[in-house]
Structures are given as C-alpha cells and as structure tokens.
Regions:
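Conserved Rossmann-fold NAD(P)-dependent oxidoreductase catalytic core, especially the SDR/UDP-sugar
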Residues: 84, 102-152, 175
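Glycine-rich NAD(P)-binding loop of the Rossmann-fold in SDR/ketoreductase-type enzymes
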Residues: 63, 95-106, 149, 153, ...
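Conserved glycine-rich Rossmann-like NAD(P)H-binding loop of the short-chain dehydrogenase/reductase
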Residues: 28-41
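Mid/C-terminal beta-alpha module of Rossmann-like enzyme folds, strongest
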Residues: 219-289, 299-320, 327-380
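Alpha-helical substrate-binding/gating segment
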Residues: 185, 190-193, 203-240
Length: 380
C-alpha cells in the first residue's frame, strides 16, 4: 500500500506544529502537505523541511479558496487545525468569526470538489469554549452537551459555526475533536488581560501538547475504525489533568518559583463567571479509540515544562511578591480587556463577568473566591 497524503492547516501553531512533528516521524507512511502563510517566521520554522520530498508547503492563506484547494487536492486526510485563537481572537473578534468560519467553508468546498470526496477523511479541531460557562456545580459534561458560548466570546461562537459548516456539509468521513486548554512550555510565559477573565472557581481538563500532536497523527492511521467517524469527541490528557483554575494558577506560579496567587494578585481582579471549561464524563472515549496519551504524571509534566523554558525565566523567582504584584496590576487594568477597566468603563462586560456591583464588592479576600476541593475522579 502506498503512502497516504495528509493536508494540515495551522502547522506553525502550537497544536499544528506538534502534529506535524508526529506525522514527520512517520513519513515512511505519510506525505505531509502544509498550508502556511508566507512570513519570515514561518519560512524560518519550515526551512529544515523544504528539501524533504515527504513535505510540501503551500504558501498561502486559509481565506483564499485557491490556496486551500491546492492543499486538499489529492489528499487522503484533511486536518483543519488552523484559524484564529486567543489572545488574538479576543482583540479581533469580528475577524475571528470571519476567518474561522470562512476557512471552514473553504475546506469543505475544496473537499467536495474532489472526485473522491467520499473517501477523504476530514478532521476539524473544535474547542471546549463551545460549551460556554460551566462553573461548579455544572462542571461535568460530555460531547453531546448543548453548546452555549459565553457572552462576548466571539471565538467560541466562531468554533460552533465552523463545526456546523462541516457537520452539515454531507461529508462521508468527518469528525470534530474539541480541544481543551493545551499545556506547553510557552504557556508559563503568557501574560495578558484574558488571564483575569478566568474564574478561580472554574475548572478545565487540560491536554498536553505532546498528546495533542500524537492525536493528529493517530487519527490518520489505517486501523482507525469506520465507527469513529461522523461524531464529536472531547480531547484531554485524562483525569489527572483535571484542575480547578485556582489549582492551575498555583501550579503555574509554583513552577516559575513565584509566590502563591494570594500574594501576587488581588482577588477582585478575577472574574466570577462567563468563561468556559468543564471536566469530561466522556474523557476516555477518544483515548479508547486513538490511544494518544503518554500518561505522564501531572507534577512530572509541569517540571518538564519548566526545564524547557529559556534560562531567564528562572530570574522570576528572585522577585519579591510585592514587585510581582506591582507588575501584574497594569494587566488587570488594561484598557479594553482588563477586568478592572470594565468596572468603570464597560458596564455590559462587567455585569457579564461579575454579575453585579454587589457581587464584585462582596469579594473582600481570597476566601471569597478560593474554591472548595472537588472530586476529580468521579463525575457528579
């Protein structure tokens, strides 16, 4: 049997790059075709692979149908990972809707234009954001849950609409894999106002970047059963990666050698609701089919992320708590997306994320937002 051709969008993003690496490690079975924007960054990333006959780069744009068609033509698998994500999606909501839905339409149109469209297997990467606000006690769910995006979350709306483009197209082989938060070394250095949109009492079931990349390669293997297709699944690295957002923040700060959240953040900086995230009743369904998890213990994984950071991140541990807090404050007060900017300047967002002025004023200490322990091993 000859090699299969895999067309991958979003290959220079976090998940897409991990998927490309996994596919490249299996290049004896796969030819990999990538659609990438013609930028200096992408040219540098892909330069080591340009001479490899197993890799073809289509320099183009997801919003240009002709470019997408060039990638899809002759492909056995189409992995649509590309699109706009946070934080860019938060700053450019209208463009996010246009790009994420428009690119889905281009991919579907290109697949249906092929003479063997019924044989092409199409994978769409959705998002946990599609489920909307699921704070406890409503924090358990599954892929069949209603999709109700959080207010002002244009990214979530774009992912719902894009998934519907695929689901309603009549494709014979289509699957939506809804991605959760991805753990990768760079996340430890991410700091923008959206960090404070996350309620400390909320939850998320994380997926490692390695598991996510392995998943993209596994789905292209011949042994994937026919019964797998035409469904939606949730992606996660398993029960041990279930955390409250407070627990995650503690782990992240601790990994960087920084003090606890109580010492570097004011509790009022964090929203109380209107985000997304849940723990999955069906967490193992996808794993049972694709076997993509490495099952690295979560503490070991955070330690490995730290070991991969540039050396200067170690300097963070030298900063006293008061200095870290002083550094964080402008982020919470940033114009536009800062939660504390909303207090006086954006009553609609303030109400959506806090509920009311009374609820906001009632946050007097960390005791008011610190969540009680939750049983992460048994769905309620």
């Amino acid at each position: 049997m000859g090699k299969k051709t895999v067309f991958l969008t979003g290959a220079t993003g976090n998940m897409g790059w991990a998927g490309f690496q996994e596919l490249y490690a299996r290049k004896e079975r796969f030819d990999i075709r990538i659609l990438a924007r013609d930028s200096r960054k992408n040219r540098k990333m892909l330069k080591p692979y340009l001479a490899d006959p197993s890799v073809t780069v289509v320099w183009g744009d997801l919003m240009r149908y002709e470019d997408v068609l060039s990638g899809v033509a002759g492909a056995d698998y189409v992995l649509h990972v590309g699109g706009m994500v946070s934080p860019a999606a938060d700053y450019y909501p209208e463009k996010t809707l246009q790009v994420n839905v428009g690119s889905a339409e281009n991919v579907v149109k290109a697949v249906l234009a092929q003479p063997d469209a019924s044989e092409i297997k199409v994978v769409y990467i959705g998002s946990v954001a599609q489920y909307g606000d699921r704070n406890p006690p409503h924090h358990w769910g599954c892929a069949s849950e209603p999709q109700v995006p959080a207010k002002f979350d244009m990214y979530a709306l774009s992912k719902i609409c894009a998934e519907q483009v695929f689901a309603s197209a009549g494709l014979k082989h289509f699957v939506s894999l809804r991605q959760s938060g991805i753990l990768y070394p760079g996340i430890l250095g991410v700091l923008n106002p959206t960090a404070f949109h996350v309620p400390m009492g909320g939850v998320l079931e994380w997926a490692t970047i390695e598991d996510s990349g392995r998943l993209l390669a596994q789905v292209c293997e011949d042994w994937v059963p026919e019964s797998f297709w035409n469904k939606a699944y949730n992606i996660s690295s398993g029960a041990q990666y279930r955390m409250t957002n407070y627990e995650f923040m503690n782990r992240m700060l601790g990994t960087l050698g920084l003090p606890s959240p109580e010492k570097v953040f004011e509790p009022q900086w964090f929203a109380l609701k209107n985000f997304h995230g849940m723990w999955y009743k069906d967490a193992d369904v996808l794993e049972d089919v694709l076997h993509f998890r490495a099952n690295v213990p979560v503490d070991e994984y955070f330690a490995s992320m730290k070991s991969k950071l540039p050396w200067f991140y170690t300097l963070a541990s030298l900063a006293p708590a008061w200095a870290v807090k002083l550094f964080m404050k402008p982020v919470a007060f940033a114009e536009g997306l800062g939660t504390q900017w909303w207090v006086e300047n954006d009553p609609e967002r303030f109400e959506a994320y806090y509920g009311s002025r009374e609820a906001y004023d009632a946050i007097r200490s960390w005791d008011d937002i610190r969540p009680a322990p939750l049983d992460k091993w048994r769905a309620e």
